[in-house]
A protein has these predicted regions:
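Acidic/polar loop-and-plug regions of large Gram-negative outer-membrane beta-barrel proteins
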Residues: 277-281, 293-364, 377-412, 456-484, ...
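C-terminal beta-signal and adjacent terminal beta-strands/loops
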Residues: 704-712, 730-777
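Membrane-embedded beta-barrel scaffold of Gram-negative outer-membrane proteins
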Residues: 362-376, 380-388, 561-562, 584-661
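Structural signature of Gram-negative outer-membrane beta-barrels, strongest in the C-terminal barrel
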Residues: 300, 412, 431-443, 486-613, ...
Length: 777
C-alpha cells in the first residue's frame, strides 16, 4: 500500500500555510492572447507580467500585474458567435489564452460547459469538474486519451490494447464506477473507432459523479461521471500545423491541422484535422493501425448566429487481445511469458469504426435570451475475433487451457437531438442563468457473440503452439454455439430545467430536475443463447424525476466550500435472460469539498463523495450473472500550481473504496469491485527556460502511481501496485517545435486488470521513447 494518505495530509497542511488570499484588482489593459489554432503559445518574454507581480530580470520595472475583468463580451473574440466564451465579469489572469472551448491560463481552464451546459466559471460549480486543456496534452506528449485523463484523480481509462465496444464493461471509470465518454456534449455510446486519437481534441472535461439533469442519449445518463471530449473548432485566422511522431515499437504517427476561412468576409470557416497511427505493441502479434479524419465547417454572421457541421471518420484495426489468465501472471506457482498472445499469429484483424455527422446551431436573440440545438447521426461497428480462454485458472492442470474461436459483432445506429433555451438576467442582488431543454436519442444495436467449440487445448507455459486455425463460427459447424444473438433498441427522452443563481456575488446556487424516460426493447434471436431456449423479447419502460442541487459559498476571496446532490439513470445493457422486465441502473451521489484560487497561482478542488448504485449488471464468465448493488466512498484532490510563467505543476490524488453492498451475484457483500485502485495519483512538473541561451527550451517530468487492484468479482486475484515515470524535453520557436519524451522511464514491469470474460490481466507498456517534430504558421 502506497502512503497516499500521508501525502494528502501534508498537501492539506501546506495549503493552510499559504499566506492570506489577496483579491486581484483590475488592470489597465487585459493581458489576454487570442490564439489562432496553429499559433505558437505566448512566449514567456512577451507575456505582460509575471505571476509574482513583477517583470523578470533585465526588464523595465512595472506595476504589479493583476487579473483583468472581462467587462466586454468575449463571445465574438475568435471570429464567430461562441457561447463557450459568454463569461461576463470573469477575471482573466495575465497571459490567458482564449480557445474555442473557453479561456485557459497555462494548465488551468477558467470555465467549463460540461457541468451545466452553460459557460460557467469552474469555481462556481458545486461539483468536482476537472479540465485537461490542450497545453497539458502537448507538454506531456500524450499519445492516447487514456494517458491524458491520468492527470485527473480517481479516473481510470480504457486499456489501449482493447478493441470493440466499451459500454457497461471495460470502459472508463470515475470514482470506481463506469463513466460515459461524450463527444462535444452528446453521447458517444460504445466509443468505437480510434477512441485514443488526440489530433482533434481542444480539451477534455471530466465531470465526476452522476449528472442526469443535462446528459441523456445512448443508454441513459452517466452513473459514475461524464468524460466530455471537446473538439477543435474553426476560427477566423488561417493557420496550419503538421507534424510527425516516431517512437518505440515502430510507432509512426503523421498528423495535420488546417484552419482556413473560405470567404473574404470570414463568415465561412473550415477546419480539418487528421492523423494516422501505425505501431506494434508490447504484446506479440498485436499490431495497430488507426486513423481519424475530422472536417468541420462553420457558417456565422460573427455577431449572434453560428452553424457548425462536424464530420468524423475513424477506424481502428488490430488483432483482438484478450489479456492473460490471472493464474500464471499475478497468481499461481508458474509464470507465463508476459508478451504472450493467445491465439494463432495468422488470426485476422478485428476492427472498430465510426462515421458520424454532428450539427450545432447557436443563436443569441438579445443580451438575455439565447438558443442552442445539437443533433448527431452515427454509424458504429465493431467486429472482434479471438481464440480465447474462458477461465483465470488452467482447465487441465498444471498449465493447459481450453480455447474457443469467438466472434463478437456489433452494429449500432444512433440519432440524438438536444435543444436548449437559455436566459441570463439580474434580479435584485442575484445574477441568474436559467436553462431549459430536451433531448431524444435512439440507438439500434444488432449484435451477436458466436463460438466454435472445436478448438484444441493449448499448454500456455511450455512453448505454446496454437494448432487450430481461427475461422469465423458458422451455424453449419457441428461445434457452433451462439452465446447471444440480439436486436436491441434503446430510446431515451428527457425534459430538464436548471437555475444557477449568484447571490450578493458570494453564494452560487444550482438547482434543477430532469424528467427522464428510458425504453429498452431487447430481442434474443438464437434459441440456444445463454439461459434462453426460445426466441424471447425483454424490455422495460421507465420514467423518473431525477434531481440535482448544490451550492458554493465564497468564505473569503479565493476560498470556497461547496456541497451537492445528484442522481443518474442508465439502461442495464447486456442482461440476457435475467428478467423479462429489467429495470435501469440508478445512482445517487452526495459530494462536499472546497475550491481555492490563491492569486491565480495555486488553484484546485478537494472533495469527499459517496455514490450508491443499484441494478448493476455483473459479468460472471460469459454473461451477466445478476444485478448487484454497489457503493463507492472516497476523497480526492486536484491541484494546479503556476507560481511563475516558467513553472507549471499538476498534482492529483484519489482514494476510492468501492464495494458490493449486497450478495445477489453470489459474491460476498463487502467484496471490492475489480479494476479500481484504492489509491492513485499523478504528479507532473514542467519548466520553461527564459535565459537568453536557453530561450525556447522546456523540460518536464512526472510520475503516475496506482495501488493494487482486484481482477475478479470474488477477489481471488489481485495485481500489485505500480508506478511509471515519464520525462520530456522540448524546443520551440515561432514556427517549429521539437520534443523528445520517455514514458515508463524506469522500465517498470507490471500488470493491470483486463476486462474480458473475468479473471484476465494485461501487461503494462514497457519503456518507450517518442520524438515529435512539427511545423506551424
Amino acid at each position: 500500500m502506497f502512503r497516499f494518505r500521508a501525502l494528502g495530509s501534508v498537501s492539506f497542511a501546506a495549503l493552510l500555510a499559504v499566506p492570506e488570499v489577496v483579491l486581484a484588482q483590475p488592470a489597465e489593459l487585459p493581458s489576454v492572447t487570442v490564439q489562432a489554432p496553429g499559433q505558437r503559445r505566448p512566449d514567456i518574454a512577451t507575456v505582460a507580467g509575471d505571476r509574482s507581480g513583477t517583470k523578470r530580470a533585465k526588464r523595465a520595472s512595472a506595476k504589479p500585474v493583476t487579473s483583468t475583468v472581462a467587462d466586454k463580451p468575449l463571445t465574438n473574440a475568435l471570429g464567430t458567435y461562441n457561447p463557450a466564451l459568454d463569461l461576463p465579469g470573469l477575471k482573466l489572469p495575465p497571459g490567458t489564452t482564449l480557445t474555442t472551448a473557453g479561456p485557459v491560463d497555462g494548465y488551468r481552464a477558467l470555465s467549463a460547459s460540461s457541468a451545466t451546459k452553460t459557460a460557467t466559471p469552474i469555481e462556481q460549480v458545486p461539483q468536482s469538474i476537472q479540465v485537461i486543456p490542450r497545453s497539458v496534452i502537448t507538454d506531456q506528449n500524450n499519445v492516447t486519451v487514456t494517458e491524458a485523463i491520468q492527470n485527473v484523480s480517481n479516473v481510470q481509462g480504457t486499456n489501449t490494447l482493447g478493441i470493440g465496444t466499451t459500454g457497461s464493461f471495460g470502459g472508463m471509470t470515475v470514482r470506481g464506477f463506469s463513466a460515459q465518454q461524450y463527444l462535444d456534449g452528446l453521447n458517444n455510446m460504445y466509443n468505437v473507432g480510434d477512441r485514443d486519437s488526440l489530433v482533434n481534441v481542444e480539451r477534455i472535461e471530466v465531470l465526476k459523479g452522476p449528472n442526469a439533469i443535462l446528459y441523456g442519449g445512448g443508454a441513459g445518463s452517466p452513473l459514475g461521471g461524464a468524460i466530455n471530449v471537446v473538439s477543435k473548432l474553426p476560427t477566423d485566422k488561417a493557420s496550419l500545423e503538421t507534424g510527425l511522431t516516431l517512437g518505440t515499437k515502430s510507432y509512426v504517427q503523421p498528423y495535420f491541422d488546417v484552419n482556413q476561412p473560405l470567404s473574404p468576409d470570414k463568415t465561412v470557416l473550415f477546419r480539418f484535422t487528421g492523423d494516422y497511427t501505425s505501431n506494434n505493441t508490447f504484446v506479440d502479434v498485436v499490431h495497430q493501425d488507426r486513423y481519424s479524419l475530422n472536417p468541420t465547417l462553420t457558417l456565422t454572421n460573427k455577431e449572434d448566429t453560428t452553424l457548425t457541421i462536424q464530420g468524423r471518420l475513424s477506424r481502428l484495426e488490430q488483432q483482438a487481445y484478450q489479456g492473460l489468465p490471472a493464474v500464471g501472471t499475478v497468481a499461481g506457482s508458474f509464470r507465463l511469458n508476459p508478451d504472450l498472445y493467445i491465439g494463432p499469429s495468422s488470426i485476422p484483424k478485428s476492427y472498430s469504426d465510426v462515421k458520424s455527422v454532428t450539427a450545432t446551431f447557436d443563436h443569441r436573440f438579445d443580451p438575455i435570451w439565447s438558443f442552442n440545438i445539437k443533433a448527431r447521426w452515427a454509424d458504429q461497428n465493431a467486429d472482434q475475433r479471438s481464440q480465447t480462454t474462458l477461465s483465470a485458472a488452467p482447465d487441465f492442470p498444471p498449465t493447459t487451457w481450453s480455447l474457443q474461436n469467438i466472434e463478437v459483432l456489433q452494429m449500432q445506429r444512433e440519432i440524438s437531438v438536444n435543444p436548449n433555451l437559455e436566459a441570463r438576467f439580474r434580479l435584485g442582488p442575484t445574477n441568474n442563468v436559467w436553462l431549459t431543454g430536451a433531448d431524444y436519442s435512439r440507438v439500434t444495436d444488432r449484435s451477436h457473440m458466436n463460438a466454435d467449440l472445436g478448438v484444441l487445448p493449448v499448454d500456455l507455459l511450455n512453448n505454446p503452439v496454437f494448432p487450430t486455425p481461427y475461422t469465423d463460427p458458422s451455424p453449419a459447424s457441428p461445434t457452433f454455439f451462439s452465446y447471444t444473438d440480439v436486436d436491441s433498441v434503446y430510446t431515451t427522452k428527457g425534459l430538464y430545467t436548471q437555475l444557477q443563481s449568484t447571490i450578493y456575488d458570494r453564494l452560487h446556487v444550482l438547482a434543477g430536475v430532469r424528467l427522464a424516460s428510458i425504453n429498452i426493447d431487447y430481442v434474443e434471436n438464437y434459441p440456444f443463447s445463454l439461459g434462453v431456449f426460445s426466441p424471447t423479447q425483454f424490455g422495460s419502460d421507465t420514467t423518473r424525476a431525477l434531481p440535482r442541487f448544490g451550492a458554493v459559498l465564497d468564505l473569503v476571496p479565493g476560498l470556497s466550500v461547496y456541497g451537492s446532490y445528484s442522481e443518474g439513470m442508465q439502461a442495464s445493457t447486456f442482461v440476457q435472460a435475467l428478467n423479462t422486465n429489467v429495470q435501469p441502473e440508478t445512482s445517487k451521489q452526495a459530494e462536499a469539498g472546497f475550491k481555492f484560487n490563491i492569486n491565480d497561482q495555486l488553484t484546485g478542488t478537494v472533495a469527499a463523495f459517496d455514490i450508491r448504485r443499484q441494478n448493476v449488471p455483473v459479468v460472471i464468465g460469459l454473461g451477466v450473472g445478476a444485478l448487484s448493488a454497489q457503493e463507492s466512498k472516497g476523497y480526492e484532490a486536484d491541484l494546479i500550481w503556476q507560481p511563475t510563467r516558467n513553472w507549471k505543476v499538476i498534482a492529483s490524488y484519489g482514494h476510492t473504496d468501492v464495494r458490493y453492498s449486497d450478495s445477489n451475484t453470489g459474491t460476498p457483500q463487502g467484496n471490492r469491485v475489480p479494476g479500481v485502485p484504492e489509491d492513485s495519483g499523478r504528479f507532473w512538473v514542467d519548466y520553461s527556460f527564459d535565459w537568453p541561451a536557453l530561450r525556447g527550451w522546456s523540460a518536464g517530468a512526472g510520475v503516475y502511481v496506482a495501488s493494487s487492484q482486484y481482477v475478479d468479482n470474488f477477489n481471488l486475484y489481485k495485481t500489485p501496485g505500480y508506478f511509471t515515470v515519464d520525462a520530456k524535453i522540448a524546443y520551440e520557436t515561432e514556427h517549429w517545435r521539437a520534443a523528445f519524451n520517455v514514458k515508463n522511464l524506469t522500465g517498470e514491469k507490471y500488470f493491470v486488470p483486463f476486462t474480458w470474460l473475468g479473471g484476465q490481466v494485461a501487461r503494462g507498456d514497457g519503456r518507450a521513447f517518442y520524438g515529435t517534430l512539427s511545423y506551424r504558421y
